[in-house]
Every structure is written in structure tokens, then in C-alpha cells.
């Protein structure tokens, strides 16, 4: 009977109901495939570390990278240590248990990260609806954390009270976390921050993204600092009016700006992997305390040195040369003219300009220093400015840090960034204006 039943079934005959069902399945699969193939090519570059992107590309254009967007955790304590793999994964695990972050990633989580010197923008890969936009100055740190096969890139950003609930995933379950498990104890009101959780397809892709963000921080800092230096020195040296000590007012407002990053790509490369259960599991990070420096202190240190080494007329010549360089003169011409101004006995003064040379000219500047025999370890400038390079080279971890997170309750009561910036420029300009008068008085 079984053999007759088998013989009775004619091969190739499909039930009409199955035919309709299979046709619908094939149609959906075809549409899904077409949806994927219709994705536009990204506006991107491919980096082979330690290769770097031209700074002009970040200033005047943008770069896109494909990532997976897990979500955004809000109301995270601001003192969260971005270098602690354990702390970061604790918040992520709590959010997954509360179904605030997806446990498994699918094609629906595909997103496009658009990066420029002004902001980081996230949009869905299909449809390209904007998920969120984070200004560069709101990014405190970027960490790469490997969790089993997942390569996570975590952005620690300022808390944004205006963000919509659909774009933000509030880590309510994380609020019950004891302070003892965090890197610092909470005393009094705690600043809140956000964690934007992304996933890259591989370790290389995650490192590349961190490298790009590191270059953005460097470009933004360098452009702002050299423009400030140009205005402060040129305006002050050209019209000396009164005398002030460079360190006469310790209470003057100082705005902390991130120190220029090490030009070598090793600062932003992440040569080691982080494995779960390893001997020393950690996320790759450089703490903010190791990278942060005051632009005011850098300028004051350098101008104090120039005050002891240059005459009033030479300082005005230095200001004019810097102004010409900022208005289109080549870095080679700038270096040659400064070399002539300083002479052999004062050529070590060129070392102090390192933090203020744009990235695009930094390699030529370093080559010029080597050509004229100026190296680290010679002269007083190395002690004042060379320490920044040494501090970076001795750093043991590697997350790229940007400006500190903003948006806390303290910030609302303090003067705006624009007011503090203008006041800092005024203070430094006044100090520099006094250089000529001060040296004339000393010589008299």
C-alpha cells in the first residue's frame, strides 16, 4: 500500500494553495533583495592604518561609514570611566536585559555614520531617516570595546534633554547601579551623559572609525588654536599700549581645549584586541586627564619664552610672519623666515610652535626641524612643550577623547562658551600687547 501511495504521487505536481504561498514568498524575497541592492554607495574613503585623511576633507567635506545602530542610553552618570570595559558593558548588559538594546543585530539595524569636523550624524541605511546628530564639541570620548564577536564603538556624549523618546533609550535599569561599581563615587548632583552604542563589522572597521574621529578632534583643535594664536599675537604685538604681567591674574577665565594630538598615527591606532575573559580585559582609551591642556597656558608659556629671547621689534616681526602664514604663505616660507629671525642661537624656539601647526603642514615642519638640527632634548622649549609629546607616547590605552561633555546644570549658570572665548582672547591679547612696553621698561 505504501508503494502504491508513493507511485500515486506524481512528481512536479504542486497544490494550488502551495503555489500561491510559494509565489508570495518568492516575491517578498525578491523585493527584499532588490531593497538591499538599491542601497546607494557611501561617500567614504578606505584607510589602511596608519594612513590618514587630508584635513581639508574633514573641514570642507564629509565621510560616511556603515555601522549598526543599537541605541542610545541616557541618564548615565557623567563620571563613567570610558576606559573601563567592565563599566561600559555593565550598562549595555542591563539595557539588553530590559529590552532597551537589541540582543541580536539584523539588517534592520544597519545605519550610516556621516562624519565631518562639525558633527557626527546617524541615519538609517534604508530610507536614510536621521536618527540623531551630535556636534563634535558634545563628544567627550570614543571607546572601542570588543565583546565576544561584537565590535562595539561607544560615543560618550553630552546629555541632550531635547532628544525625542523615539531616538533615545533611557537606561532606567542602570540607575540602580551601585556607586561602588563605577570608577568614581557620586557625591552630590551627578552630571548626566549619554552613550551612543554602535557596532562595526570587524576590529579593523572599529579601529578605522576611532582613527577618523581622532583626526576630527585634532583638526578642530588645531584650527581653533592657531586662529586664536594668530589673532592674539598679531593684534597685541602691533599695537602695544600698556603693561601687564603674563601671569598677573590667576583668576582670569580659562577655557580648557583639548591638546593637539600626536601627529603619528599610533595615537589613534589600536594594535591590541580586547577579548572577553582575557588576562586584562579593557576598552581602548586615553583618559581625558592625559590629553587635556589649556590653550591659554600653551600660549602664555610660549609668549613668556619669546619675551625673554626676542626684542620688541622681533616680536612684531614674528606676529607679521604668523599673519602672513595664516593668510596663504607656505609653511616652507614661514619656517625659513622664522629661522632667519631666530638665528642659530635661538632656533630651538621653533619647537614651541609645534602645537599650533596645522596637521597638513606638520610633517613639513617636523622635517624642517630635523634639517636644521633641532630635536627634542635641546633648549628650554623642549621642557615646556615637549612634555606633551612625551605624555602621549607613554599612554598605555587608546580611546580618542574630544572636548568634555557639556550640558550639565553647572554650564547653565556659567557664562556661555562664546563669552569665555572672547574673554580669554582679550586677556591673552592684553598680555601680549604688554611685551613690547615691558621689555622697553626693563632695558631702561
UniProtKB/Swiss-Prot annotation:
Q: Which family does it belong to?
A: Belongs to the CCM2 family.
Which UniProt keywords are present, listed alphabetically? Answer: Cytoplasm, Developmental protein, Disease variant, Phosphoprotein
Compositionally biased residues, Basic and acidic residues: 22-37
Name the chain's protein. Answer: Cerebral cavernous malformations 2 protein
Residue span(s) of domain PID = 59-248
Question: Which residue intervals make up region (Disordered)?
Answer: 1-37, 391-423
Q: Where is the composition biased (Low complexity)?
A: 392-408
What Gene3D superfamilies would the database entry show? 1.20.1160.20, Pleckstrin-homology domain (PH domain)/Phosphotyrosine-binding domain (PTB) (2.30.29.30)
Gene encoding this polypeptide?
Answer: CCM2
Residues bearing Phosphoserine are 15, 164, 384, 393, 396
